[in-house]
C-alpha cells in the first residue's frame, strides 16, 4: 500500500507506541488531548494539532483518559505515493525534507484545519467508494490536497517561529548596542540608522 488512513478513538487511559517505518506519518487530532513522547521531544496531541513523523521515527502516545475521548486520524504516505502526487513544479517529499524536523506538532490555522479534517474523514471512506465514477482521479485529488495543506501548515508554523526568533534577536541586538553606548546620547534617528528599522517599531 502506498498510503493508509485509519481512525483511532481512545476513551480510557491509554499508552500506545507508533512507528512510521518507511512512511511519512501524519496524525490529525480531531478532539481530545494527550501527549506524544518521541526520542527528542514531547509533542502536544491536542485538538487542531497536526503531528508529523518522518520515516524511521517513533513515538509513544499517552492519553490520561480525562476530559473526554481522544480521536486521531492517522494518514501514512510512502515516498512513492508522494512522488505520484507531485508535479513538475512541486516535489512533495523534498518539501517535507526541507522542514527541519524529524518529529513535529504544528497547529494549522482554523481554515486549513477544517479542510484537513474534512479531507481526512473522506480518506477513511474512499475504499468503499472505489466503484464510483472517477474514483481514482478523486482519490488522487483528495490526497494531493491533504498533502499540500499539511505542508502549508508546516511552512506557516516555520515562518511564525522564524519571525518570533528574529524579533527576539533584534531586541537583543538593540539592548546590547544601548548597553555599549550608555555614556553617549542615543537618539531614535541613530537607532533607525543602526538597525534599519522605523522608530515606530
Across the structure, where does each feature detected by a protein language model lie?
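Short beta-strand/loop turn elements enriched in aromatics
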Residues: 10-22
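Short, Lys/Arg-enriched, Trp-marked, Pro/Gly-tolerant hinge/linker segments that flank
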Residues: 99-113, 127-195
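Histidine-centered metal-chelating micro-motifs
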Residues: 15-16, 35, 51, 55-64, ...
Amino acid at each position: 500500500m502506498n498510503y493508509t488512513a485509519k481512525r483511532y478513538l481512545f476513551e480510557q487511559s491509554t499508552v500506545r507506541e507508533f512507528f512510521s517505518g518507511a512512511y511519512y506519518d501524519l496524525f490529525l487530532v480531531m478532539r481530545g488531548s494527550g501527549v506524544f513522547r518521541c526520542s527528542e521531544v514531547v509533542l502536544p496531541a491536542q485538538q487542531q494539532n497536526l503531528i508529523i513523523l518522518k520515516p524511521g521515527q517513533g513515538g509513544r502516545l499517552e492519553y490520561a483518559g480525562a476530559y473526554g475521548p481522544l480521536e486521531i486520524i492517522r494518514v501514512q504516505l510512502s515516498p512513492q505515493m508522494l512522488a505520484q502526487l507531485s508535479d513538475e513544479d512541486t516535489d512533495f517529499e523534498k518539501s517535507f525534507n526541507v522542514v527541519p524536523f524529524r518529529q513535529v506538532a504544528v497547529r494549522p490555522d482554523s481554515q486549513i484545519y477544517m479542510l484537513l479534517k474534512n479531507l481526512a474523514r473522506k480518506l477513511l471512506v474512499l475504499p468503499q467508494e472505489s466503484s464510483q465514477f472517477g474514483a481514482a482521479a478523486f482519490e488522487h485529488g483528495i490526497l494531493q490536497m491533504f498533502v499540500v495543506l499539511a505542508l502549508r501548515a508546516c511552512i506557516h508554523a516555520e515562518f511564525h517561529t522564524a519571525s518570533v526568533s528574529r524579533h527576539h534577536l533584534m531586541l537583543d541586538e538593540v539592548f546590547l548596542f544601548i548597553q555599549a553606548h550608555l555614556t553617549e546620547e542615543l537618539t531614535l534617528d541613530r537607532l533607525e540608522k543602526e538597525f534599519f528599522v522605523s522608530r515606530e517599531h
